[in-house]
Amino acid sequence: MPGGLLLGDEAPNFEANTTIGRIRFHDYLGDSWGILFSHPRDFTPVCTTELGRAAKLAPEFAKRNVKMIALSIDSVEDHLAWSKDINAYNGEEPTEKLPFPIIDDKNRDLAIQLGMLDPAEKDEKGMPVTARVVFIFGPDKKLKLSILYPATTGRNFDEILRVIISLQLTAEKRVATPVDWKNGDSVMVLPTIPEEEAKKLFPKGVFTKELPSGKKYLRYTPQP
């Protein structure tokens, strides 16, 4: 799959037609965090459930200063008509308005540039469609996380929200989040922080797990 972004790469400042008009990506993001997520096609079952859940969680992303934007190879007109189905799926008034815009990439220019095409899934003309990609960008416009799912597997937007919370926390504090971490759970002290410095940085206490190796690298502290 040509194109693509690596962690730390700056988001391209592309222009695109969307359901809220023409945008320039960096201007749209401003100083916010951003989630750019693609889906294979409008008017399809898995995509409808995904964007429905994304719409439900939009207030949670917004209060964390995260802007969302979707993308597929369908037209703006299709996006707007499909938005009615998404809102109806959510049990809401079937309007054309979603809490985030959807990009029209019917020429696949962005999908190719960003490495979003799924070679195993093709449209009626035999052309590959967009995979289920998630890119998370920081306020510096650099890629902080990427996830790539095939067309047959829907994403977990609650997990994407959890990841955002972790990324924002670890960007501000010298901690890491362990396996299955949830907001409010204890976090891990970075192994690069000396013991005495850790005591000053984390006044709520640092708790070290004793291990057979005798190495004191499993250090927990309450979430700052």
Swiss-Prot record:
One of its GO terms (cellular component) is cytosol. This is Peroxiredoxin-6. The keyword Acetylation applies. The gene is PRDX6. Homodimer. Interacts with GSTP1; mediates PRDX6 glutathionylation and regeneration. Interacts with APEX1. Interacts with STH. May interact with FAM168B. May interact with HTR2A. The modification N6-acetyllysine is found at K63, K209. Its main location: cytoplasm. Gene3D superfamilies: Antioxidant, Horf6, Chain A, domain2, Glutaredoxin. The modification Phosphotyrosine is found at Y89. Does not need Ca(2+) as cofactor. It catalyses: a hydroperoxide + 2 glutathione = an alcohol + glutathione disulfide + H2O; a 1,2-diacyl-sn-glycero-3-phosphocholine + H2O = a 1-acyl-sn-glycero-3-phosphocholine + a fatty acid + H(+); a 1-acyl-sn-glycero-3-phosphocholine + an acyl-CoA = a 1,2-diacyl-sn-glycero-3-phosphocholine + CoA; 1-hexadecanoyl-sn-glycero-3-phosphocholine + hexadecanoyl-CoA = 1,2-dihexadecanoyl-sn-glycero-3-phosphocholine + CoA. The record marks S32 as: Important for phospholipase activity. The keyword Isomerase does not apply. Belongs to the peroxiredoxin family. Prx6 subfamily. InterPro entries: AhpC/TSA, Peroxiredoxin_AhpC-typ, Peroxiredoxin_C, PRX_1cys, Thioredoxin-like_sf, Thioredoxin_domain. Residues 5-169 form the Thioredoxin domain. CDD domains: PRX_1cys. Keywords: Acetylation, Antioxidant, Cytoplasm, Hydrolase, Lipid degradation, Lipid metabolism, Lysosome, Multifunctional enzyme, Oxidoreductase, Peroxidase, Phosphoprotein, Redox-active center, Transferase. It comes from Bos taurus (Bovine). The active site is a conserved redox-active cysteine residue, the peroxidatic cysteine (C(P)), which makes the nucleophilic attack on the peroxide substrate. The peroxide oxidizes the C(P)-SH to cysteine sulfenic acid (C(P)-SOH), which then reacts with another cysteine residue, the resolving cysteine (C(R)), to form a disulfide bridge. The disulfide is subsequently reduced by an appropriate electron donor to complete the catalytic cycle. In this 1-Cys peroxiredoxin, no C(R) is present and C(P) instead forms a disulfide with a cysteine from another protein or with a small thiol molecule. It comes from the Eukaryota. The modification Phosphothreonine is found at T44, T177. The active site is at C47 (cysteine sulfenic acid (-soh) intermediate), D140 (for phospholipase activity). Residues 31-40 are annotated as: Required and sufficient for targeting to lysosomes and lamellar bodies. The modification N6-succinyllysine is found at K209. One of its GO terms (molecular function) is peroxiredoxin activity. Irreversibly inactivated by overoxidation of Cys-47 to sulfinic acid (Cys-SO(2)H) and sulfonic acid (Cys-SO(3)H) forms upon oxidative stress. Phosphorylation at Thr-177 by MAP kinases increases the phospholipase activity of the enzyme. The phosphorylated form exhibits a greater lysophosphatidylcholine acyltransferase activity compared to the non-phosphorylated form.
